[in-house]
Amino acid sequence: MQALYDVPAPAKLNLFLHVTGRRPDGYHLLQSVFMLIDWCDVLHFEVGGNGAVTREDLTSALPADDLVVRAARALQKATGCPQGVHIGVSKHIPAQAGLGGGSSDAASTLLALNRLWKLKLSRQQLHSIALTLGADVPFFLCGASAWVEGIGDIIRPLELEHQLPPAAFAVVKPEAGLDTRMIFSHPSLKRDSSCATISGFAATHYQFGSNDLQPVAQALCPEITQAINWLESKGLQGRMTGSGSAVFAQITHAVDLHDAPAAWHVKVCENLKSHPLADWVFG
């Protein structure tokens, strides 16, 4: 096998996000449920023999040293693999949205190259590499929606009794984006939410909890409030995902979403029962 085409990298929604504390080293302690949705970037991989890692942007331009390139090079370094790869990236998930697009691209890159380069690394071995790339990357290797704690490093796929029922969501990305660091460094960020339980979450699923980052994000980015108000005008209860600026709402009735501002990304998504590449790795 010398190539893999049309490799999906799905986005995620944070159904809730509580900040429960802060470590002495400054990292925040979180609780969240990360849910996979069917809004995907698409990646293409062609093996090269000279060890070079190159990337082609098939849609919007990406930074020269983005997470896709970093993931490929981290895998080379960890394994001593002499092979290279040319990666084509068709970007559909908006950046600075809280949807995890860059992290998902990195995870799909690890999974695809583990197969193409015949490395046979286990999920846990890939997880160790993913940790060096960013807090959200390991989640996209776990294969399913998950309960996430700690600094994002404690990941538990939802057990059968806690799994999410199928649902559709309106996801709205305003034109403006947000720098995550500005939110976590803000003095008014709530950092003392009570610890939640998986059973408590499972009792209400999509109505559970809140996003502790949202008040600060709304103060920094008024478009988030505008997007939530727009969803509410449709009879939908919006909340922010991750550190924004995207917001989402479960669709519970027929709704027309065609009158959004032209600069916004609006997409109706469904949740995924499992990651489309879940069976590409063992362990």
From Swiss-Prot:
Residues that, per the record, bind ATP: P94, A95, Q96, A97, G98, L99, G100, G101, G102, S103, S104
Catalytic activity annotation: 4-CDP-2-C-methyl-D-erythritol + ATP = 4-CDP-2-C-methyl-D-erythritol 2-phosphate + ADP + H(+)
Organism: Acidovorax sp. (strain JS42)
GO MF, one example: 4-(cytidine 5'-diphospho)-2-C-methyl-D-erythritol kinase activity
UniProt keyword annotation of Transmembrane present: no
PANTHER family in UniProt: 4-DIPHOSPHOCYTIDYL-2-C-METHYL-D-ERYTHRITOL KINASE, CHLOROPLASTIC (PTHR43527:SF2)
Enzyme class: transferase
Keywords: ATP-binding, Isoprene biosynthesis, Kinase, Nucleotide-binding, Transferase
The protein's role, per its UniProt record: Catalyzes the phosphorylation of the position 2 hydroxy group of 4-diphosphocytidyl-2C-methyl-D-erythritol.
Record-linked HAMAP family: IspE
Keyword Cytoplasm annotated: no
GN (gene name): ispE
Chain ranges passing through the membrane: none
Family, as annotated: Belongs to the GHMP kinase family. IspE subfamily.
GO biological process: isopentenyl diphosphate biosynthetic process, methylerythritol 4-phosphate pathway; terpenoid biosynthetic process
Xref: Pfam families: GHMP_kinases_C, GHMP_kinases_N
EC number(s) recorded for this UniProt protein: 2.7.1.148
Pathway of action: Isoprenoid biosynthesis; isopentenyl diphosphate biosynthesis via DXP pathway; isopentenyl diphosphate from 1-deoxy-D-xylulose 5-phosphate: step 3/6
Protein name: 4-diphosphocytidyl-2-C-methyl-D-erythritol kinase
Active site: K12, D136
